[in-house]
Amino acid sequence: MSYSSTETSTYTTIDVEAVMRRITADLVMIAASTGAITESKAREYAHDIELLAKNGYLDYVDVTLISNGVEQKATRFHVNESGELANDRPGDARWPRIQGAYLRIVVNNRSTYDQAARQKLSGKMKISWSPCSDDISHSGLTQSGGREYSSNGYGMQRKDYN
């Protein structure tokens, strides 16, 4: 006798929105604590990230605080559709305020984000995104903790670097 098992994970745009509320809270907290961008600008980034996520194009988002060419702190939000993540509360995203520092926000999209996808989202994005070839491996920082945000089968895992 043989048995089989099928496991599926489904989610809706409502689930993506629920997770994005937590990501937005983190981005706003990072913006407010560093002073590197305004809360309004953080919400514009969050809008675009959510748009990419809702359309299934987003792989991860990398946020880095840079001062004098040196990474000070970073966090990476990686999409996870396994349905196995916890649902933590946003927080622990207060970063230092360093004079002259700036935030680098990089989105990495899935291969499905092709020319047709760009056309589909044309005019809907709030940030003027451009290609980035920076090293975002955070080799000078140490991975330390993070958070998990999920709703049904959709989630994002946050990894922090100090």
Curated annotation (Swiss-Prot):
One of its GO terms (biological process) is defense response to virus. The keyword Cell wall biogenesis/degradation does not apply. Residues 139-154 have a biased composition (Polar residues). Keywords: Antiviral defense. Pfam families: bacHORMA_1. Residues 138-162 are annotated as: Disordered. Signal peptide: none annotated. The keyword rRNA-binding does not apply. It comes from the Bacteria. Belongs to the HORMA family. HORMA1 subfamily. Sensor protein of a CBASS antivirus system. CBASS (cyclic oligonucleotide-based antiphage signaling system) provides immunity against bacteriophage. The CD-NTase protein synthesizes cyclic nucleotides in response to infection; these serve as specific second messenger signals. The signals activate a diverse range of effectors, leading to bacterial cell death and thus abortive phage infection. A type III CBASS system. Expression of this CBASS system (Cap18-Cap6-Cap7-CdnC-CapW-Cap17) in a susceptible E.coli (strain MG1655) confers resistance to bacteriophage P1. Forms complexes with CdnC with 1:1 and 2:2 stoichimetry, and a 1:1:6 CdnC:Cap7:Cap6 complex. This is CD-NTase-associated protein 7. It comes from Escherichia coli (strain KTE188). The gene is cap7.
